[in-house]
Amino acid sequence: MKHLGRHVLAEICGCDFDILNDIEKVEEIMVNAALEAGAEVRECVFHKFSPQGVSGVVVISESHLAIHTWPELGYAAVDVFTCGDKVNPWDACNYLSERFSAKHMTAREMKRGIIPETYLKEVANL
């Protein structure tokens, strides 16, 4: 069955505290991860928490990359959602794991936009 996109959810552990707590560094790494995967970056929004932690989103033409960091735990929760077949979300996740100096990453991929054929036929008739 066809799908519209791929959504990888990654648990990245054993990361460098200073990197995960640096908003500029996290944004730079996230943008470069999108580019590494072959995506076209549109916009970025990042926020620094007190006393530590960063959350952010990189909006790409093909969907998005999102991150929430817990530097005190060396942990980052990452989503990479891509539409089409030109961008590989796994390339972005592997890049992030490497650049965060992670000791471990687990990830799962979910196909998104699996629309039943009967519904597509209904929509086509509107």
Curated annotation (Swiss-Prot):
Gene Ontology BP annotations: spermidine biosynthetic process
Role played: Catalyzes the decarboxylation of S-adenosylmethionine to S-adenosylmethioninamine (dcAdoMet), the propylamine donor required for the synthesis of the polyamines spermine and spermidine from the diamine putrescine.
Description of post-translational modifications: Is synthesized initially as an inactive proenzyme. Formation of the active enzyme involves a self-maturation process in which the active site pyruvoyl group is generated from an internal serine residue via an autocatalytic post-translational modification. Two non-identical subunits are generated from the proenzyme in this reaction, and the pyruvate is formed at the N-terminus of the alpha chain, which is derived from the carboxyl end of the proenzyme.
Assembly information from the UniProt record: Heterotetramer of two alpha and two beta chains arranged as a dimer of alpha/beta heterodimers.
PANTHER family on file: S-ADENOSYLMETHIONINE DECARBOXYLASE PROENZYME
UniProt KW keywords: Autocatalytic cleavage, Decarboxylase, Lyase, Polyamine biosynthesis, Pyruvate, S-adenosyl-L-methionine, Schiff base, Spermidine biosynthesis, Zymogen
Catalytic-site annotation from UniProt: S63 (schiff-base intermediate with substrate), H68 (proton acceptor), C83 (proton donor)
Pathway in which this enzyme or protein is active: Amine and polyamine biosynthesis; S-adenosylmethioninamine biosynthesis; S-adenosylmethioninamine from S-adenosyl-L-methionine: step 1/1
Cofactor: pyruvate
The UniProt record lists the keyword S-adenosyl-L-methionine: yes
GO MF term (any one): adenosylmethionine decarboxylase activity
Co-factor binding details: Binds 1 pyruvoyl group covalently per subunit.
SUPFAM superfamilies, per the entry: S-adenosylmethionine decarboxylase
Known catalytic reactions: S-adenosyl-L-methionine + H(+) = S-adenosyl 3-(methylsulfanyl)propylamine + CO2
Pyruvic acid (Ser) modifications at: S63
EC number: 4.1.1.50
Protein name: S-adenosylmethionine decarboxylase proenzyme
